Amino acid sequence: RIQSNIDLPQALEVFVGNVHRYCSKFLFEENIIPAGSSIIDDDDAISILSGYLEEEEQGVSSNPTLRRSYFSCVQLAAFIFQLKSNHPKELRLHPDCITADDVTALRYLCQQLHIELSASTMVDIFDHSKRYADALDNPLFDYGMAKLLKSFFKRVDIANYYASYKDENQLYDFEDLLMLTYNAYTSPSANEYRHYSWVQIDEVQDLNALQLAIVDAITTKEQRSVVYLGDEQQAIFSFMGAKLSTLSLLKERCKGHIYHLHTNHRAPSYLVKV
């Protein structure tokens, strides 16, 4: 559409799309993910996990409770990847996939094994969950804690299977696109990738912290122009990990260059009043 309206060679260099689309385009063009790879959605994730758990796929899809339990494992897989990639804590997509009960039980486990609960310990637990689960056979182990840990280790097993299945079949979900792009743009070879001196982001309140970090990473450090467009009222609904704190951060960053639009020019007044 841009090329059909702007007859300039520079039009070919303009990218228009959401953050996920940019990440997908970037990862394929830079051969960070193989050309034969496929992008999967939530339904595909349910299909993968229902096969592993030997549950009827349609039954899972139509059951909100089962869907939530499945996606808690998908989210845990992303959490594990981010932990292994040393992503800053504030950029984690699903920090709440590790519940307060999980933390309490893991602290108890570490106390029994005389080790400290840290990020590196968590990575080791994720990589060797079956070995750690053997500790639950100790008859002196607290029953309540053992029950919590069995539930946790089951989720870890499912999350690890999901990650392994994707790797073996060259599959990537939408969160993989974000995490891999962030890794690439924060790696030692980041200067080899294209950066943009002019960036415009619409619906910025819908961006989560990782998406915003990607926008920052692809923007040139010098002589840049960045425009953020958003609706503060919509931000209160916290969509897809986005929070009001995103706009608060941008307010501080853009202090002195913030403009409020109060007139709606996209709809007639009688429609707005309905």
Language model features with spans:
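Conserved P-loop NTPase-based nucleic-acid remodeling module centered on helicase motor cores
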Residues: 2-101, 248
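Conserved ATP-driven helicase/translocase motor core recognized via long
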Residues: 57, 78-157, 161, 165
